[in-house]
Amino acid sequence: MSFTEEETKLGKSLFEACSFTERPIAKDSHLETVRQVMRKNIPATITTSDLGLFTDEEEATKKKEIIQGDITIDGTTPLHVICSSFPSDATAEELEVALEMMRELFQWGAGWMLLDEQGQTPGCVAWDRSKAEARDSVLASVYNEIVSAGTRSEVFLRRINKSENVEFLSDDDDEEMDVDDDEEDESRDGEETGDIQQAIADAIKQAKEAGLEVVVDGETVEEVPELVGDKEDEKNNESAAQNEVDLAGSQMDYLKDKLTYTDDNKTLITTQNDGVMMDWEDEIMQKSADLLVSRADKESDGPVVLNVGFGLGIIDTYLQSKKPSKHYICEAHPDVLEKMEKDGWMDKPGVTVLVGRWQDTLPGLLSQGVYFDGMYYDTFSENYSDLVDFFDHVVGLLAPTGVFSFFNGLGADRQVCYDVYKNVVEVDLQEYGLNVEYQVIKVNKDVTGADGHVWDGIKRRYWVVEDFYLPVCTF
Protein backbone atom coordinates (compact mmCIF):
# COMPACT_ATOMS: atom_id res chain seq x y z
CA MET A 1 0.00 0.00 0.00
CA SER A 2 1.50 3.33 -1.08
CA PHE A 3 0.58 6.86 -0.01
CA THR A 4 1.25 10.36 -1.24
CA GLU A 5 3.34 12.73 0.84
CA GLU A 6 0.20 14.40 2.20
CA GLU A 7 -1.43 11.05 3.04
CA THR A 8 1.74 9.89 4.76
CA LYS A 9 1.71 13.04 6.87
CA LEU A 10 -1.91 12.39 7.85
CA GLY A 11 -1.13 8.77 8.67
CA LYS A 12 1.73 9.76 10.93
CA SER A 13 -0.46 12.25 12.75
CA LEU A 14 -2.99 9.46 13.31
CA PHE A 15 -0.40 7.20 14.90
CA GLU A 16 0.92 10.08 16.98
CA ALA A 17 -2.55 10.78 18.37
CA CYS A 18 -3.05 7.08 19.14
CA SER A 19 0.31 6.96 20.94
CA PHE A 20 -0.94 9.41 23.60
CA THR A 21 2.43 11.11 23.88
CA GLU A 22 0.62 14.32 24.80
CA ARG A 23 -1.57 14.52 27.90
CA PRO A 24 -4.28 15.08 28.78
CA ILE A 25 -6.08 12.94 26.24
CA ALA A 26 -8.80 15.23 24.95
CA LYS A 27 -11.62 15.29 22.41
CA ASP A 28 -10.53 18.47 20.68
CA SER A 29 -7.04 17.11 20.03
CA HIS A 30 -6.80 13.31 20.00
CA LEU A 31 -10.34 12.39 18.95
CA GLU A 32 -10.58 15.23 16.46
CA THR A 33 -7.33 14.12 14.81
CA VAL A 34 -8.73 10.62 14.29
CA ARG A 35 -11.93 12.02 12.80
CA GLN A 36 -10.12 14.39 10.44
CA VAL A 37 -7.74 11.70 9.19
CA MET A 38 -10.58 9.24 8.60
CA ARG A 39 -12.52 11.86 6.62
CA LYS A 40 -9.50 12.20 4.35
CA ASN A 41 -9.99 8.54 3.37
CA ILE A 42 -6.91 7.25 5.15
CA PRO A 43 -7.77 3.58 5.86
CA ALA A 44 -8.35 2.67 9.50
CA THR A 45 -6.27 -0.44 8.80
CA ILE A 46 -3.17 1.57 7.88
CA THR A 47 -0.02 0.13 9.47
CA THR A 48 3.31 1.47 10.68
CA SER A 49 5.03 -0.49 7.93
CA ASP A 50 2.84 1.23 5.33
CA LEU A 51 4.36 4.49 6.50
CA GLY A 52 7.89 3.17 7.01
CA LEU A 53 7.67 3.66 10.76
CA PHE A 54 9.66 0.60 11.82
CA THR A 55 11.78 1.84 14.70
CA ASP A 56 14.49 -0.81 14.65
CA GLU A 57 15.81 -3.74 12.67
CA GLU A 58 14.59 -6.26 15.26
CA GLU A 59 10.92 -5.42 14.65
CA ALA A 60 11.33 -5.90 10.91
CA THR A 61 13.13 -9.21 11.51
CA LYS A 62 10.28 -10.49 13.70
CA LYS A 63 7.80 -9.64 10.99
CA LYS A 64 9.84 -11.54 8.41
CA GLU A 65 10.07 -14.60 10.66
CA ILE A 66 6.33 -14.68 11.35
CA ILE A 67 5.40 -14.15 7.71
CA GLN A 68 7.39 -17.30 6.92
CA GLY A 69 5.19 -19.19 9.39
CA ASP A 70 1.56 -20.25 8.98
CA ILE A 71 -0.20 -17.00 9.84
CA THR A 72 -0.74 -13.83 7.86
CA ILE A 73 0.75 -10.66 9.29
CA ASP A 74 -1.10 -7.40 8.67
CA GLY A 75 1.05 -4.97 10.67
CA THR A 76 0.71 -2.57 13.59
CA THR A 77 -2.52 -0.61 13.15
CA PRO A 78 -3.79 2.45 15.07
CA LEU A 79 -5.84 0.09 17.25
CA HIS A 80 -2.69 -1.81 18.20
CA VAL A 81 -1.02 1.45 19.15
CA ILE A 82 -3.97 2.57 21.30
CA CYS A 83 -3.96 -0.76 23.13
CA SER A 84 -0.21 -0.70 23.70
CA SER A 85 0.10 3.01 24.56
CA PHE A 86 -2.98 3.92 26.58
CA PRO A 87 -1.71 5.04 30.01
CA SER A 88 -2.72 2.90 32.99
CA ASP A 89 -3.07 6.05 35.11
CA ALA A 90 -5.57 7.69 32.76
CA THR A 91 -8.54 9.51 34.21
CA ALA A 92 -12.14 8.51 33.54
CA GLU A 93 -12.44 11.43 31.11
CA GLU A 94 -9.32 10.33 29.22
CA LEU A 95 -10.60 6.77 29.06
CA GLU A 96 -13.87 7.89 27.49
CA VAL A 97 -11.97 9.84 24.81
CA ALA A 98 -9.82 6.81 24.00
CA LEU A 99 -12.89 4.59 23.73
CA GLU A 100 -14.49 7.09 21.36
CA MET A 101 -11.31 7.03 19.28
CA MET A 102 -11.57 3.26 19.05
CA ARG A 103 -15.25 3.42 18.10
CA GLU A 104 -14.44 5.95 15.40
CA LEU A 105 -11.80 3.65 13.96
CA PHE A 106 -14.20 0.70 14.03
CA GLN A 107 -16.81 2.75 12.18
CA TRP A 108 -14.25 3.32 9.43
CA GLY A 109 -13.38 -0.37 9.09
CA ALA A 110 -10.66 -1.06 11.67
CA GLY A 111 -10.18 -4.80 12.16
CA TRP A 112 -10.31 -6.39 15.59
CA MET A 113 -8.51 -9.51 14.33
CA LEU A 114 -5.62 -7.96 12.39
CA LEU A 115 -2.20 -9.23 13.46
CA ASP A 116 0.82 -7.05 14.21
CA GLU A 117 4.46 -8.01 13.64
CA GLN A 118 4.41 -10.19 16.76
CA GLY A 119 1.30 -12.05 15.61
CA GLN A 120 -0.91 -10.24 18.15
CA THR A 121 -4.36 -8.73 17.66
CA PRO A 122 -5.21 -5.41 19.33
CA GLY A 123 -7.21 -7.41 21.87
CA CYS A 124 -4.20 -9.61 22.61
CA VAL A 125 -2.11 -6.52 23.32
CA ALA A 126 -4.78 -5.03 25.59
CA TRP A 127 -5.30 -8.34 27.40
CA ASP A 128 -1.61 -8.83 28.12
CA ARG A 129 -1.40 -5.35 29.59
CA SER A 130 -4.61 -5.64 31.61
CA LYS A 131 -3.42 -8.93 33.15
CA ALA A 132 -0.74 -6.97 34.98
CA GLU A 133 -3.34 -4.59 36.37
CA ALA A 134 -6.61 -5.03 38.24
CA ARG A 135 -9.34 -6.52 36.06
CA ASP A 136 -11.45 -3.40 36.64
CA SER A 137 -8.66 -1.07 35.53
CA VAL A 138 -8.88 1.38 32.64
CA LEU A 139 -6.84 -1.09 30.56
CA ALA A 140 -9.57 -3.69 31.08
CA SER A 141 -12.06 -1.19 29.66
CA VAL A 142 -9.93 -0.88 26.52
CA TYR A 143 -9.89 -4.67 26.19
CA ASN A 144 -13.66 -4.91 26.69
CA GLU A 145 -14.20 -2.39 23.91
CA ILE A 146 -12.33 -4.71 21.55
CA VAL A 147 -14.47 -7.66 22.67
CA SER A 148 -17.68 -5.68 22.11
CA ALA A 149 -16.59 -4.69 18.62
CA GLY A 150 -15.55 -8.25 17.81
CA THR A 151 -18.92 -9.56 18.97
CA ARG A 152 -20.81 -7.08 16.80
CA SER A 153 -18.63 -7.95 13.82
CA GLU A 154 -19.04 -11.72 14.17
CA VAL A 155 -22.79 -11.54 14.73
CA PHE A 156 -23.16 -9.27 11.71
CA LEU A 157 -21.06 -11.55 9.50
CA ARG A 158 -23.10 -14.57 10.58
CA ARG A 159 -26.29 -12.75 9.64
CA ILE A 160 -24.84 -11.88 6.24
CA ASN A 161 -23.70 -15.46 5.62
CA LYS A 162 -27.17 -16.75 6.52
CA SER A 163 -28.79 -14.44 3.98
CA GLU A 164 -29.45 -15.95 0.58
CA ASN A 165 -28.58 -14.43 -2.82
CA VAL A 166 -27.02 -11.23 -1.53
CA GLU A 167 -26.31 -10.04 -5.08
CA PHE A 168 -27.58 -7.23 -7.22
CA LEU A 169 -27.92 -8.28 -10.86
CA SER A 170 -29.34 -6.66 -13.93
CA ASP A 171 -32.33 -8.32 -15.59
CA ASP A 172 -30.12 -9.42 -18.50
CA ASP A 173 -27.58 -11.10 -16.22
CA ASP A 174 -30.07 -12.60 -13.80
CA GLU A 175 -31.20 -15.63 -15.82
CA GLU A 176 -27.71 -16.48 -17.05
CA MET A 177 -26.23 -16.24 -13.57
CA ASP A 178 -29.00 -18.41 -12.10
CA VAL A 179 -28.26 -21.18 -14.60
CA ASP A 180 -24.51 -21.07 -13.97
CA ASP A 181 -24.97 -20.96 -10.21
CA ASP A 182 -27.41 -23.87 -10.26
CA GLU A 183 -24.99 -26.01 -12.27
CA GLU A 184 -22.09 -25.11 -9.98
CA ASP A 185 -24.14 -25.75 -6.84
CA GLU A 186 -25.35 -29.11 -8.15
CA SER A 187 -21.79 -30.13 -8.95
CA ARG A 188 -20.50 -29.04 -5.56
CA ASP A 189 -23.44 -30.58 -3.72
CA GLY A 190 -22.92 -33.82 -5.60
CA GLU A 191 -19.27 -34.00 -4.61
CA GLU A 192 -20.00 -33.22 -0.96
CA THR A 193 -22.92 -35.65 -0.80
CA GLY A 194 -20.79 -38.38 -2.32
CA ASP A 195 -18.04 -37.81 0.23
CA ILE A 196 -20.50 -37.90 3.12
CA GLN A 197 -22.21 -41.04 1.81
CA GLN A 198 -18.88 -42.78 1.36
CA ALA A 199 -17.74 -41.83 4.87
CA ILE A 200 -21.02 -43.08 6.34
CA ALA A 201 -20.83 -46.32 4.35
CA ASP A 202 -17.26 -46.92 5.54
CA ALA A 203 -18.24 -46.29 9.16
CA ILE A 204 -21.26 -48.61 8.90
CA LYS A 205 -19.18 -51.33 7.25
CA GLN A 206 -16.54 -51.29 9.98
CA ALA A 207 -19.19 -51.16 12.69
CA LYS A 208 -20.99 -54.17 11.20
CA GLU A 209 -17.71 -56.07 10.92
CA ALA A 210 -17.17 -55.40 14.63
CA GLY A 211 -20.57 -56.92 15.37
CA LEU A 212 -22.24 -53.64 16.33
CA GLU A 213 -25.88 -52.73 15.81
CA VAL A 214 -26.18 -49.74 13.50
CA VAL A 215 -29.21 -47.47 13.92
CA VAL A 216 -30.02 -44.69 11.43
CA ASP A 217 -33.17 -42.58 11.75
CA GLY A 218 -34.45 -44.98 14.40
CA GLU A 219 -34.14 -48.09 12.20
CA THR A 220 -31.57 -50.88 12.34
CA VAL A 221 -29.34 -51.07 9.25
CA GLU A 222 -28.96 -54.69 8.11
CA GLU A 223 -26.76 -54.18 5.04
CA VAL A 224 -23.98 -51.80 4.13
CA PRO A 225 -25.29 -49.34 1.52
CA GLU A 226 -23.76 -49.80 -1.91
CA LEU A 227 -22.38 -46.75 -3.66
CA VAL A 228 -21.89 -46.35 -7.38
CA GLY A 229 -18.19 -46.26 -8.11
CA ASP A 230 -15.40 -47.88 -10.05
CA LYS A 231 -11.69 -48.49 -9.86
CA GLU A 232 -11.03 -45.08 -11.36
CA ASP A 233 -12.85 -43.46 -8.43
CA GLU A 234 -10.80 -45.49 -5.98
CA LYS A 235 -7.60 -44.50 -7.75
CA ASN A 236 -8.57 -40.84 -7.64
CA ASN A 237 -9.46 -41.11 -3.95
CA GLU A 238 -6.10 -42.68 -3.15
CA SER A 239 -4.33 -39.92 -5.04
CA ALA A 240 -6.32 -37.23 -3.23
CA ALA A 241 -5.57 -38.82 0.13
CA GLN A 242 -1.88 -38.27 -0.46
CA ASN A 243 -2.45 -34.53 -0.31
CA GLU A 244 -2.63 -33.46 3.34
CA VAL A 245 -5.98 -32.02 4.32
CA ASP A 246 -7.14 -30.20 7.41
CA LEU A 247 -8.71 -33.06 9.33
CA ALA A 248 -9.92 -30.67 12.03
CA GLY A 249 -12.01 -28.84 9.44
CA SER A 250 -13.19 -31.67 7.20
CA GLN A 251 -15.57 -34.22 8.67
CA MET A 252 -15.47 -36.56 5.69
CA ASP A 253 -11.67 -36.74 5.72
CA TYR A 254 -11.64 -37.12 9.50
CA LEU A 255 -14.04 -40.08 9.41
CA LYS A 256 -11.76 -41.80 6.90
CA ASP A 257 -8.59 -41.08 8.87
CA LYS A 258 -6.91 -43.60 11.15
CA LEU A 259 -7.13 -42.59 14.82
CA THR A 260 -4.71 -43.77 17.48
CA TYR A 261 -5.12 -44.09 21.23
CA THR A 262 -1.79 -43.62 23.00
CA ASP A 263 -0.59 -46.53 25.13
CA ASP A 264 -1.53 -44.73 28.35
CA ASN A 265 -4.99 -43.92 26.90
CA LYS A 266 -4.42 -40.24 27.68
CA THR A 267 -4.61 -38.93 24.12
CA LEU A 268 -6.54 -39.66 20.95
CA ILE A 269 -4.78 -38.39 17.82
CA THR A 270 -5.15 -38.35 14.04
CA THR A 271 -2.48 -39.38 11.54
CA GLN A 272 -1.52 -35.70 11.42
CA ASN A 273 -1.05 -35.61 15.20
CA ASP A 274 -4.14 -33.49 15.78
CA GLY A 275 -5.33 -33.84 19.35
CA VAL A 276 -8.88 -35.20 19.01
CA MET A 277 -9.12 -35.46 22.80
CA MET A 278 -6.63 -35.28 25.67
CA ASP A 279 -6.87 -36.26 29.32
CA TRP A 280 -6.11 -32.74 30.58
CA GLU A 281 -9.83 -32.19 29.92
CA ASP A 282 -10.70 -34.58 32.77
CA GLU A 283 -11.81 -31.94 35.32
CA ILE A 284 -13.89 -30.19 32.67
CA MET A 285 -15.61 -33.46 31.82
CA GLN A 286 -16.23 -34.28 35.47
CA LYS A 287 -17.92 -30.96 36.12
CA SER A 288 -19.82 -31.22 32.84
CA ALA A 289 -21.19 -34.61 33.91
CA ASP A 290 -22.22 -33.15 37.26
CA LEU A 291 -24.02 -30.38 35.38
CA LEU A 292 -25.89 -32.72 33.04
CA VAL A 293 -27.64 -34.54 35.89
CA SER A 294 -28.09 -31.51 38.16
CA ARG A 295 -31.68 -30.79 37.09
CA ALA A 296 -32.95 -34.38 36.77
CA ASP A 297 -35.98 -35.49 38.78
CA LYS A 298 -34.66 -37.02 42.00
CA GLU A 299 -37.72 -39.28 42.21
CA SER A 300 -37.10 -40.84 38.78
CA ASP A 301 -35.28 -44.10 38.02
CA GLY A 302 -32.25 -42.04 37.01
CA PRO A 303 -31.35 -39.28 34.58
CA VAL A 304 -31.65 -39.68 30.82
CA VAL A 305 -28.51 -38.30 29.17
CA LEU A 306 -26.94 -37.92 25.73
CA ASN A 307 -23.30 -37.37 24.81
CA VAL A 308 -22.30 -36.67 21.22
CA GLY A 309 -18.66 -37.57 20.60
CA PHE A 310 -17.11 -40.35 22.73
CA GLY A 311 -13.39 -39.57 22.32
CA LEU A 312 -11.56 -40.94 25.36
CA GLY A 313 -14.85 -41.72 27.07
CA ILE A 314 -14.10 -39.42 30.00
CA ILE A 315 -17.48 -37.75 30.33
CA ASP A 316 -19.34 -40.99 29.62
CA THR A 317 -17.42 -42.71 32.42
CA TYR A 318 -18.43 -39.94 34.82
CA LEU A 319 -22.02 -40.10 33.57
CA GLN A 320 -22.13 -43.84 34.26
CA SER A 321 -21.24 -43.12 37.89
CA LYS A 322 -24.46 -41.07 38.09
CA LYS A 323 -26.53 -44.23 37.49
CA PRO A 324 -28.50 -42.96 34.47
CA SER A 325 -31.64 -44.85 33.53
CA LYS A 326 -30.81 -44.28 29.87
CA HIS A 327 -27.43 -43.24 28.51
CA TYR A 328 -27.16 -42.47 24.79
CA ILE A 329 -23.76 -42.07 23.11
CA CYS A 330 -23.50 -40.86 19.53
CA GLU A 331 -20.25 -41.71 17.74
CA ALA A 332 -19.38 -41.85 14.04
CA HIS A 333 -15.70 -42.76 13.81
CA PRO A 334 -15.08 -46.49 13.23
CA ASP A 335 -11.83 -46.54 15.25
CA VAL A 336 -13.57 -45.03 18.26
CA LEU A 337 -16.45 -47.48 17.88
CA GLU A 338 -13.96 -50.33 17.81
CA LYS A 339 -12.43 -49.05 21.05
CA MET A 340 -15.88 -48.77 22.62
CA GLU A 341 -16.65 -52.37 21.66
CA LYS A 342 -13.32 -53.55 23.07
CA ASP A 343 -13.93 -51.74 26.37
CA GLY A 344 -17.43 -53.16 26.77
CA TRP A 345 -19.49 -50.02 26.22
CA MET A 346 -21.87 -51.81 23.86
CA ASP A 347 -22.91 -54.21 26.63
CA LYS A 348 -23.37 -51.77 29.51
CA PRO A 349 -26.92 -51.78 30.92
CA GLY A 350 -28.93 -48.76 29.84
CA VAL A 351 -26.34 -47.65 27.26
CA THR A 352 -27.47 -47.10 23.66
CA VAL A 353 -24.75 -46.37 21.12
CA LEU A 354 -25.97 -44.39 18.13
CA VAL A 355 -23.57 -45.35 15.34
CA GLY A 356 -23.10 -42.55 12.83
CA ARG A 357 -23.17 -38.79 12.57
CA TRP A 358 -25.57 -37.01 14.91
CA GLN A 359 -27.12 -35.38 11.85
CA ASP A 360 -28.28 -38.87 10.79
CA THR A 361 -29.02 -40.57 14.12
CA LEU A 362 -30.72 -37.92 16.26
CA PRO A 363 -33.76 -37.30 14.01
CA GLY A 364 -34.93 -40.83 14.83
CA LEU A 365 -35.04 -39.96 18.53
CA LEU A 366 -37.31 -37.02 17.80
CA SER A 367 -39.93 -39.37 16.37
CA GLN A 368 -39.60 -41.71 19.38
CA GLY A 369 -40.49 -39.02 21.90
CA VAL A 370 -37.17 -39.23 23.76
CA TYR A 371 -36.37 -36.34 26.10
CA PHE A 372 -33.07 -35.75 27.86
CA ASP A 373 -32.30 -34.38 31.30
CA GLY A 374 -28.82 -33.59 30.03
CA MET A 375 -27.29 -33.20 26.55
CA TYR A 376 -23.59 -32.74 25.76
CA TYR A 377 -21.87 -31.93 22.46
CA ASP A 378 -18.15 -32.52 21.93
CA THR A 379 -17.26 -33.36 18.35
CA PHE A 380 -14.09 -33.09 16.28
CA SER A 381 -13.84 -31.72 12.73
CA GLU A 382 -17.06 -29.70 12.97
CA ASN A 383 -17.38 -25.92 12.84
CA TYR A 384 -19.35 -23.37 14.83
CA SER A 385 -22.11 -23.49 12.23
CA ASP A 386 -22.52 -27.21 12.99
CA LEU A 387 -22.91 -26.42 16.68
CA VAL A 388 -25.62 -23.88 15.84
CA ASP A 389 -27.37 -26.53 13.73
CA PHE A 390 -27.21 -28.81 16.78
CA PHE A 391 -29.20 -26.22 18.74
CA ASP A 392 -32.19 -27.26 16.59
CA HIS A 393 -32.01 -30.77 18.04
CA VAL A 394 -31.53 -29.42 21.55
CA VAL A 395 -34.85 -27.61 21.31
CA GLY A 396 -36.58 -30.82 20.22
CA LEU A 397 -34.88 -33.30 22.56
CA LEU A 398 -34.14 -31.42 25.79
CA ALA A 399 -36.65 -31.85 28.61
CA PRO A 400 -38.26 -28.59 29.82
CA THR A 401 -36.19 -28.78 33.01
CA GLY A 402 -33.10 -30.21 31.29
CA VAL A 403 -29.67 -28.70 30.70
CA PHE A 404 -27.51 -28.62 27.59
CA SER A 405 -23.78 -27.99 27.47
CA PHE A 406 -20.81 -28.46 25.16
CA PHE A 407 -17.03 -28.47 25.17
CA ASN A 408 -16.48 -24.76 24.78
CA GLY A 409 -13.25 -24.48 22.84
CA LEU A 410 -14.48 -21.72 20.53
CA GLY A 411 -11.51 -19.44 19.84
CA ALA A 412 -9.58 -20.88 22.78
CA ASP A 413 -6.22 -20.23 21.11
CA ARG A 414 -6.65 -16.48 21.84
CA GLN A 415 -8.31 -14.93 24.89
CA VAL A 416 -9.98 -12.19 22.88
CA CYS A 417 -11.50 -14.72 20.44
CA TYR A 418 -12.69 -16.85 23.36
CA ASP A 419 -14.41 -13.87 24.96
CA VAL A 420 -15.97 -12.78 21.67
CA TYR A 421 -17.46 -16.20 20.95
CA LYS A 422 -18.70 -16.46 24.51
CA ASN A 423 -20.94 -13.52 23.60
CA VAL A 424 -21.78 -14.77 20.10
CA VAL A 425 -23.03 -18.08 21.53
CA GLU A 426 -25.33 -16.19 23.87
CA VAL A 427 -26.84 -14.26 20.95
CA ASP A 428 -27.39 -17.41 18.86
CA LEU A 429 -28.86 -19.42 21.74
CA GLN A 430 -31.39 -16.67 22.42
CA GLU A 431 -32.79 -17.21 18.92
CA TYR A 432 -33.61 -20.78 19.97
CA GLY A 433 -35.25 -19.72 23.21
CA LEU A 434 -32.31 -20.89 25.31
CA ASN A 435 -30.58 -18.99 28.10
CA VAL A 436 -26.90 -19.49 28.87
CA GLU A 437 -24.74 -18.84 31.89
CA TYR A 438 -21.13 -19.85 32.34
CA GLN A 439 -19.34 -21.66 35.13
CA VAL A 440 -15.64 -20.81 35.26
CA ILE A 441 -13.14 -23.66 35.55
CA LYS A 442 -9.45 -22.89 36.01
CA VAL A 443 -7.26 -24.73 33.51
CA ASN A 444 -3.97 -26.25 34.70
CA LYS A 445 -0.88 -24.15 33.94
CA ASP A 446 0.74 -27.20 32.34
CA VAL A 447 -1.86 -26.72 29.61
CA THR A 448 -1.87 -22.93 29.29
CA GLY A 449 1.81 -22.21 29.95
CA ALA A 450 4.27 -21.47 27.17
CA ASP A 451 6.19 -24.67 27.95
CA GLY A 452 3.17 -26.88 28.53
CA HIS A 453 4.53 -30.42 28.22
CA VAL A 454 1.07 -31.87 27.65
CA TRP A 455 1.30 -30.67 24.05
CA ASP A 456 4.45 -32.64 23.25
CA GLY A 457 3.89 -34.46 19.97
CA ILE A 458 0.65 -32.60 19.22
CA LYS A 459 0.49 -30.69 15.95
CA ARG A 460 -1.32 -27.62 17.26
CA ARG A 461 -2.25 -26.35 20.69
CA TYR A 462 -6.00 -25.89 20.71
CA TRP A 463 -6.05 -24.36 24.18
CA VAL A 464 -4.11 -21.42 25.69
CA VAL A 465 -6.64 -19.48 27.81
CA GLU A 466 -6.58 -19.73 31.60
CA ASP A 467 -10.32 -20.11 32.26
CA PHE A 468 -12.74 -22.59 30.73
CA TYR A 469 -16.26 -21.20 30.37
CA LEU A 470 -18.61 -24.14 30.91
CA PRO A 471 -21.93 -23.31 29.20
CA VAL A 472 -25.09 -23.93 31.22
CA CYS A 473 -27.92 -23.77 28.67
CA THR A 474 -31.53 -24.03 29.80
CA PHE A 475 -35.01 -23.02 28.65
Curated annotation (Swiss-Prot):
InterPro entries the record matches: Arginine_N-MeTrfase_2, RMT2/GAMT_Mtase, RMT2_dom, SAM-dependent_MTases_sf
Gene Ontology cellular-component terms listed: cytoplasm; nucleus
Keyword set includes NAD: no
Subcellular compartments: Cytoplasm; Nucleus
GO molecular function, one term: protein arginine N5-methyltransferase activity
Compositionally biased region (Acidic residues): 169-194
Stretches assigned to the RMT2 domain: 247-475
EC code(s) of this entry: 2.1.1.-
Lineage top rank: taxon: Eukaryota
Region (Disordered): 167-194
CDD domains, alphabetized: AdoMet_MTases
Annotated function: S-adenosyl-L-methionine-dependent protein-arginine N-methyltransferase that methylates the delta-nitrogen atom of arginine residues to form N5-methylarginine (type IV) in target proteins. Monomethylates ribosomal protein L12.
Record's protein name: Protein arginine N-methyltransferase 2
